[in-house]
């Protein structure tokens, strides 16, 4: 499998379980119901973006981005989180998400 076989799309509320599962690979213990609540809030905000990498309609990675600004600087993006499933790492998926 290569990164071109992956589709990048905006996260949907129905992705919450998969997102929580992938977050657990980073050491976070996200309850699916809590993840669903937080994801819904993130998706409703215009200053945040949450993208999912799908392979064969299965989420295999995600990135959470937030827009931030300082008085002394233009707006910039902060990466709140980025994960690719262990089985899919080192194939360019993280690069595609970025």
Where is each model-derived feature located?
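A short beta-loop-alpha structural element at the N-terminal edge
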Residues: 6-19
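Hydrophobic/basic alpha-helical segments enriched in Actinobacteria
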Residues: 10-12, 50, 54, 59, ...
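Residue-level recognition of the GNAT/N-acetyltransferase active site
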Residues: 12, 85, 89
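Helix-loop element at the rim of GNAT/NAT acetyltransferase active sites that forms part
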Residues: 20-33
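Active-site rim helix/loop that mediates acceptor-substrate recognition in acyltransferases
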Residues: 30-50
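Conserved beta-strand in the GNAT
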Residues: 52, 58-67, 78, 83
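A conserved beta-turn-beta hairpin within the catalytic core of GNAT-like acetyltransferases
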Residues: 69-79, 89
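Conserved acetyl-CoA pyrophosphate-binding loop and the N-cap/start of the following alpha-helix
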Residues: 88, 92-97
């Amino acid at each position: 499998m290569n990164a071109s076989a992956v589709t990048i799309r905006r996260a949907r509320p129905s992705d919450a379980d998969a997102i929580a599962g992938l977050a657990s690979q980073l050491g976070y213990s996200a309850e699916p119901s809590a993840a669903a609540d937080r994801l819904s809030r993130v998706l409703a905000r215009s200053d945040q973006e949450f993208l999912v990498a799908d392979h064969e309609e299965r989420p295999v990675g995600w990135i959470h981005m937030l827009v931030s600004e300082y008085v002394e600087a233009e707006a910039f993006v902060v990466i709140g989180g980025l994960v690719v499933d262990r089985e899919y790492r080192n194939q360019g998926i993280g690069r595609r998400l970025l």
